């Protein structure tokens, strides 16, 4: 017998749980099905939310024949068979799993069929199609993002399976404690496939009572779904979403949010990404407002790397809280980015002659190094002279902020020097 998650796959668009922003009657996919006019599309979202099942349900809601292939497993010959069927029948829906893994040869073969509409592609992927899918394919498809399933929607899927006598567990007399149901719904981490298969394991592995009832307790549920599933693909879209939220929470001084995202990265065992991002934050977002934050973060990272997980969470948490509650300044990154923008725009100019290297024979004959004023020979180690090239001689890249004691002190010095020019 096939697993419960497979048996409970929706066959019609009305059976789809969740994704109402796409499949409801008044939403885009719902309207396409009602109008009997499907366009090629890419469905993307996290693992276990039913992308391929939804694709099958969409195709099954039409009168058009459909075929399922996998971009990795199936070869070009398999696609040629689908194309031949499309030529004979006029149109075929191709459900293509892992569409982001489509190689160039298969892409080139599919493109003309997508162009003339003989093949309607419904691709499924966990990867962000804007990053992972060839632009030629993207331009011929609609891209729809599927939303993670909430615990309430997971419970809806479980209840449906418990009462379905044909495909589900409806032929069994099952009672399930509320706490057990909550564990399945929350413990699967949004993966309905995992929740359904855990429920089936619980039902099939639990002995009937004297009255023929199968009673599922929290203990049984925890045994069948032992660890809270946490989906975190280090190369996936969600990984960069978490890192982005992590940095933005620290930048926004929200220690609680930052600790939440840190915990997600820790749970994924992603020490390398945490370390890199914390160092970037220390210099990009804290910057000159508290320059000692950088070395302290580095020390925390080195400690974390030395002790490893689970203890690594302690120095990392210390560093995150300090960064959250430190004064913030991005004056340095703004300054260097403005300087780089000038360089890339061709605003360069020649190095002033008095600053050019004069440590070789004949340099003075070329006018190099002449009239250079050595600052250490002057009061307070400063003397007025031009350092920037002529086209930029009055340019000010650095614009100090006063969000920390250190940069406030730097600003006083900087302002004083600017006035003396």
Curated annotation (Swiss-Prot):
The protein's name in its UniProt record: Replication-associated recombination protein A
Function: Plays a role in recombination-dependent DNA replication. Positively affects the formation of RecA threads during response to DNA damage, directly or indirectly counteracting the negative RecA modulators RecX and RecU. Stabilizes a RecA-ssDNA complex. In vitro, in the presence of SsbA, inhibits PriA-dependent DNA replication restart of both leading and lagging strands; elongation is insensitive to RarA. Plays a role in response to DNA damage, localizes to the replication fork but also to DNA elsewhere in the cell. Probably required for repair of single-stranded nicks generated by H(2)O(2).
Family membership noted in the UniProt record: Belongs to the AAA ATPase family. RarA/MGS1/WRNIP1 subfamily.
Disruption phenotype: Full RecA induction does not occur in response to DNA damaging agents; RecA 'threads' do not form in response to H(2)O(2) treatment. Increased sensitivity to DNA damaging agents H(2)O(2) and mitomycin C. Double dnaB temperature-sensitive-rarA deletion strains die at 42 degrees Celsius. Double dnaC temperature-sensitive-rarA deletion strains are very growth impaired at 42 degrees Celsius. Double dnaD temperature-sensitive-rarA deletion strains grow less well at 39 degrees Celsius. No changes in sensitivity to DNA damaging agents methyl methanesulfonate (MMS) or 4-nitroquinolone-1-oxide (4NQO).
GO cellular-component term (any): nucleoid
Gene Ontology annotations of biological process type: DNA recombination; DNA synthesis involved in DNA repair; DNA-templated DNA replication
Activity modulation comment: ssDNA-dependent ATP hydrolysis is stimulated by single-stranded binding protein SsbA but not by SsbB; in the presence of SsbB, ssDNA secondary structure is removed and RarA's ATPase activity is decreased. The C-terminal 9 residues of SsbA are sufficient to stimulate ATPase activity.
Keywords noted in UniProt: ATP-binding, Cytoplasm, DNA-binding, Hydrolase, Nucleotide-binding
Record carries keyword Lyase: no
Any one Gene Ontology molecular-function term assigned to this protein's record: enzyme activator activity
Main location: cytoplasm
Top-tier EC class: hydrolase
Alphabetized Gene3D superfamilies for the sequence: 1.10.8.60, 1.20.272.10, DNA polymerase III clamp loader subunits, C-terminal domain, P-loop containing nucleotide triphosphate hydrolases
Originating organism: Bacillus subtilis (strain 168)
CDD domains linked to this entry: AAA, HLD_clamp_RarA
The keyword DNA-binding belongs to this UniProt entry's keyword annotation: yes
Domain of life: Bacteria
EC number: 3.6.4.-
Quaternary assembly: Homotetramer. Interacts with single-stranded binding protein SsbA. May interact with PriA.
């Amino acid at each position: 017998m096939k697993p419960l998650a497979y048996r409970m796959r929706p066959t019609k668009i009305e059976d789809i749980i969740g994704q109402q922003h796409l499949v409801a009657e008044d939403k885009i996919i719902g309207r396409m099905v009602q109008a009997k006019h499907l366009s090629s599309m890419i469905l993307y979202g996290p693992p276990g939310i039913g992308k391929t099942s939804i694709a099958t349900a969409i195709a099954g809601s039409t009168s058009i024949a459909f075929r399922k292939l996998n971009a990795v497993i199936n070869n070009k010959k398999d696609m040629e068979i689908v194309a031949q069927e499309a030529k004979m029948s006029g149109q075929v829906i191709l459900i293509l799993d892992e569409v982001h893994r489509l190689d160039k040869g298969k892409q080139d073969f599919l493109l003309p069929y997508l162009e003339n509409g003989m093949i309607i592609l419904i691709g499924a992927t966990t990867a962000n199609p804007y990053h992972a899918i060839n632009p030629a394919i993207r331009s011929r498809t609609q891209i729809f993002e599927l939303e993670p399933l909430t615990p309430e929607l997971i419970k809806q899927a479980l209840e449906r399976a418990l009462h379905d006598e044909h495909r589900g567990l409806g032929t069994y007399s099952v009672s399930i404690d509320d706490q057990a149901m909550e564990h399945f719904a929350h413990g699967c981490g949004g993966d309905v496939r995992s929740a359904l298969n855990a429920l089936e394991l619980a039902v099939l592995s639990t002995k009937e009572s004297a009255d023929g009832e199968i009673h599922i307790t929290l203990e049984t549920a925890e045994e069948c779904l032992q660890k809270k599933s946490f989906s975190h693909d280090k190369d996936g879209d969600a990984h960069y979403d978490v890192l982005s939220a992590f940095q933005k929470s620290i930048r926004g001084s929200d220690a609680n949010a930052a600790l939440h995202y840190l915990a997600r990265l820790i749970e994924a065992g992603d020490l390398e990404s945490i370390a890199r991002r914390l160092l970037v934050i220390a210099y990009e977002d804290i910057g000159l407002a508290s320059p000692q934050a950088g070395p302290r973060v580095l020390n925390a990272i080195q400690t974390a790397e030395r002790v490893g997980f689970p203890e690594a969470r302690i120095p990392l948490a210390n560093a995150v809280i300090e960064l959250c509650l430190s004064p913030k300044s991005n004056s340095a990154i703004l300054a260097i980015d403005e300087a780089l923008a000038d360089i890339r725009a061709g605003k360069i100019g020649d190095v002033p002659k008095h600053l050019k290297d004069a440590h070789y024979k004949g340099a003075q004959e070329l006018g190099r190094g002449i009239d250079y004023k050595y600052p250490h020979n002057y009061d307070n180690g400063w003397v007025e002279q031009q350092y920037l090239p002529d086209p930029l001689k009055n340019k000010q890249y650095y614009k100090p902020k006063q969000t920390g004691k250190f940069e406030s002190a730097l600003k006083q010095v900087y302002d004083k020097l600017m006035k003396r020019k």
